[in-house]
Amino acid sequence: MSISKTLPYNAIEQIKSYLLQLQNTICVLLESIDGKTRFHEDSWQRAAGGGGRTRIMTNGNVFEKAGVNFSHVSGEQLPASASAHREELAGRHFSALGVSLVIHPQNPYVPTTHANVRFFVAEKEDSEPVWWFGGGFDLTPYYGFVEDCEHWHQTALNACLPFGETIYPKFKRWCDDYFFIKHRNEARGIGGLFFDDYNEISFDHSFELMRSIGDHFILAYEPIVARRKDIPFGNREKAFQNYRRGRYAEFNLVYDRGTLFGLQSGGRTESILMSLPPTVHWEYNWHPEKGSDEEKLYTDFLPAKDWLKKE
């Protein structure tokens, strides 16, 4: 493996090929799981440069709304959300490629999930390109199951182990910190992996890590869906799901870096906001019943912890 951080001449083509394949693979698997509804594809172009391929599934047997979006956009200047902590990026033109997905299930016992893998490069004449990878995946249950959390985090560990024993704890902690709703003082879910600004060792090494995380997502999510999708539920569980979806919407509209980047860079609004739940309910000063399964989400699952099963 090369130890140079030089960007290969065909880096964009390599990454784009992988991302399109990843989008296809995930969509085929989700359609197979759902068994009723197929993805609607919407290809789009961005006037300032680039475009994408948005795929949306709605009102399925298993998935109430699922979006799997590929985008490849470029521009003359990075928006503030991407350059605020990297002053050396000022005045550089950029390219950004990624696959981002959010899945909102019908059954409240099936968790919502989000995953994203992406690549940025910022270039300037007579200067070396500045590039990095980012992404991760995280899980947002409404009703917690220890075995699901353990499986999710074990799969996250498996994605990271080929790249060293320090990667998983670092990316896990980063995920816990990132997906925290500060104004509510609570986590969005039970975490997973999150990383950004990653360009360690070489392009090949960094690209392989991004691919590993992308490829492990469906391995983490599919078994959980299979275990929970047929559990009976009623109005109480659906109401709690819609209430908790409000937290999801709050995070995405207030804090999410990808949402801010997309809106600030003149991205396609429909694709950027595909992450929002189809139905949401806010209730003033609501609190779960003492000892209820709803309360256990707050006490036993949302606080950050080590979910790896002890041997």
Curated annotation (Swiss-Prot):
Gene Ontology molecular-function annotations: coproporphyrinogen oxidase activity; metal ion binding; protein homodimerization activity
Main location: cytoplasm
EC top class named in words: oxidoreductase
Cofactor needs: a divalent metal cation
Complex formation: Homodimer.
Pfam families: Coprogen_oxidas (PF01218)
Pathway annotation from the record: Porphyrin-containing compound metabolism; protoporphyrin-IX biosynthesis; protoporphyrinogen-IX from coproporphyrinogen-III (O2 route): step 1/1
Transmembrane among keywords: no
Feature type site, description Important for dimerization: 183
Localization: Cytoplasm
Gene: hemF
Binding site for substrate: 100, 116-118, 266-268
Domain of life: Bacteria
Protein name (database record): Oxygen-dependent coproporphyrinogen-III oxidase
